[in-house]
């Protein structure tokens, strides 16, 4: 079966059931999920798929919208710990700064699952599973396409403007790294401007219009 980023979240719910202790089998499983926000149509569909997967699995879902703020996710995770949920899952706003709250979840013996985005922590045992994409490879693929396209006109050089996602998020960091890796050493491909669009249509449009005005 071909897994998309949307139905991988359904798999996350299945994974949650798998990591929960058998003792929970006699009662509905309770999962606390902290979503990044509702910054795009994709994220809205992502949230809908999570809620649908929980309903179909008979899971009691406690849902929290972080509104793209890490501090809101930390508060939500601590609330889930206080409520003694069986599993915590979240799609992290940014990549770093999670060690303390994840240690609290581990101390409470509540397994944590990362969905869509990864984190950087000092101890990998602070979460039990990551279900998501290889964002570095996504960046490489975009760059490979550009490299192949550039070969059609070898006499031309290309100035690149880069529209990034949320500052500090795994997708933004990793896609940039993968893209830069492939174009490194190619003198005909040069990134001249780079700015965040916060993964929103409105901000992305605003930034791209500014790019076109200043560089177009």
Regions of interest found by a model, annotated:
Residues 10-15:
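Sec-dependent N-terminal signal peptides
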Residues 5-9:
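N-terminal export leaders
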Residues 2-3, 24-216:
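A residue-level marker of the well-folded mature domains of exported/periplasmic proteins
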Residues 20-22:
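N-terminal signal peptide c-region/cleavage motif recognized by signal peptidases
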């Amino acid at each position: 079966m071909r897994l998309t980023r949307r139905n991988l979240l359904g798999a996350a719910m299945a994974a949650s059931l798998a990591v929960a202790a058998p003792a929970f089998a006699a009662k509905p499983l309770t999962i606390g999920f902290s979503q990044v926000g509702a910054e795009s149509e994709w994220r809205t569909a992502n949230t809908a798929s999570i809620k649908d997967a929980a309903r179909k699995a008979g899971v009691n879902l406690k849902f929290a919208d972080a509104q793209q703020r890490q501090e809101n996710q930390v508060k939500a995770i601590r609330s889930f710990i206080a409520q003694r949920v069986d599993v915590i899952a979240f799609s992290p706003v940014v990549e770093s700064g999670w060690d303390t709250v994840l240690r609290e979840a581990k101390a409470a013996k509540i397994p944590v699952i990362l969905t869509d985005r990864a984190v950087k922590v000092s101890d990998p045992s602070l979460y039990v599973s990551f279900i998501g994409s290889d964002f570095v490879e996504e960046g490489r693929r975009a760059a490979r396409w550009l490299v192949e396209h550039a070969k059609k006109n070898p006499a031309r050089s290309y100035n690149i403007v880069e529209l990034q996602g949320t500052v500090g998020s795994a997708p933004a960091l990793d896609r940039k790294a993968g893209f830069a890796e492939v174009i490194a050493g190619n003198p005909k491909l040069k990134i001249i401007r780079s700015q965040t669009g916060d993964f929103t249509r409105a901000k992305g449009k605003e930034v791209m219009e500014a790019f076109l005005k200043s560089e177009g």
